[in-house]
Regions:
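Structural beta-strand segments of beta-rich domains
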Residues: 10-14
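Short beta-strand element of the alpha/beta-hydrolase
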Residues: 151-155, 161-172
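Alpha/beta-hydrolase fold nucleophile elbow
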Residues: 249-259
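N-terminal cap/lid segment of alpha/beta-hydrolase-fold proteins
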Residues: 2, 114-159
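Cap/lid segment of the alpha/beta-hydrolase catalytic domain
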Residues: 174-235, 243, 290-300
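Short, aromatic- and glycine-rich surface loops/edge beta-strands on solvent-exposed regions
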Residues: 64-76
């Protein structure tokens, strides 16, 4: 199917060609595996390309999900691997994770911690990043337990009232430059970090932290919801909304956007803070972590992919 979408019970087929510098190879063996996305392969077979192409009959699925084919060709002493995935009624996928009974009660109580946190904003102009239309600042503000959130704020120079965009980060430990392009179009944009450190330092420092104390930070404190790494981050995102609304050029409207880890943070911030009026999410991480317990893949960081943990 051109759109790579199948109905449940329908047989999926993959056309296979092998190219060497754009020239089709013939009579070459292709080893392939079929799996339900990131789960272990349930089929391992080989075909030989007759003429210039072949067909892999990958089968079907009885439940909504994704079927993945991994194809391997050995040619002139080297192995080459390619992947292709099709969906089986993916719009009918439902999460396996269940909402904890005390979820809303817990977060209602936890959010009240921010009432005692002074915003104490700091804004330092980054002159060499400013343009004729946009001012750029390195900013910080208070968060729980005496920590601070840091980010880069870009804001139109022209007087007026503007909507704000909170840009939450993907995974990793890295510097930030700010979004001058969006600000030039008439938005206040705050790009925040989540590690409680300035975001305009030398790149080597972030590499050291990523390989050191912040290695595998997604697991830090995971034994208890009150100590988990992202609890402070979620609250910091809500505090970021406070910061944006405190700006004199704010028109009172705030949107949030992010991808991967940032997609998760965008969803979380929108749920926890009803002041958010627009939400942008692309390939969100942390989705349906418990799916592995039910024989189906979950999203990054795949907490339960290891069967020993399950």
């Amino acid at each position: 199917h051109e759109d790579a979408i199948y109905r449940l019970g329908e047989t999926s087929k993959f056309k296979v060609v092998a190219l060497d510098c754009g020239i089709m190879l013939s009579n070459i063996q292709v080893d392939y595996e079929v799996s339900e996305d990131l789960m272990p392969a349930h089929t391992k077979k080989s075909i030989t390309l007759k003429g210039n192409e072949g067909t892999i009959v990958a089968g079907t699925m009885k439940q909504p999900g994704y079927l993945r084919v991994k194809a391997v060709v050995e040619h002139e002493g080297s192995k080459y691997t390619s992947y292709s995935t099709v969906g089986f009624e993916p719009d009918k996928l439902l999460p396996k994770v269940k909402m904890p009974e005390d979820f809303d009660a817990y977060w209602t109580k936890t959010l009240k911690l921010l009432d005692k946190v002074e915003l104490a904003p700091k804004m330092d102009l980054i002159a060499d990043r400013c343009t004729d239309k946009v001012d750029v600042y390195h900013i910080s503000f208070g968060n729980i337990k005496g920590t601070r959130m840091y980010g880069v704020l870009t804001m139109p120079k022209k007087e007026g009232k503007y909507p704000s965009i909170l840009k939450v980060p993907g995974a990793g430990v890295h510097a930030m430059s700010g979004n001058v392009a969006w600000a030039a179009k008439g938005a206040i944009v705050l790009e925040i970090g989540i590690h409680g450190i300035p975001v305009i330092l030398e790149s080597g420092l972030y590499s050291d932290l990523s390989n050191g104390v912040l290695s595998n930070y997604v697991l830090h404190g995971i034994e208890n919801r009150d100590t988990y790494f992202f609890r402070r981050v979620y609250l910091g995102c809500v505090k970021a909304v406070d910061f944006l609304l405190s700006l004199t050029k704010s028109n009172g409207k705030v949107g949030v956007i992010g991808g991967s880890q940032g997609g998760m943070l965008s969803l979380a911030t929108s749920y926890l803070d009803k002041r958010i009026s627009a939400t942008g999410v692309y390939f969100p991480a942390f989705c349906d972590q418990e799916a592995y317990m039910h024989g189906r893949t979950g999203g990054w960081p795949h907490f339960f992919k290891n069967k020993e943990i399950c």
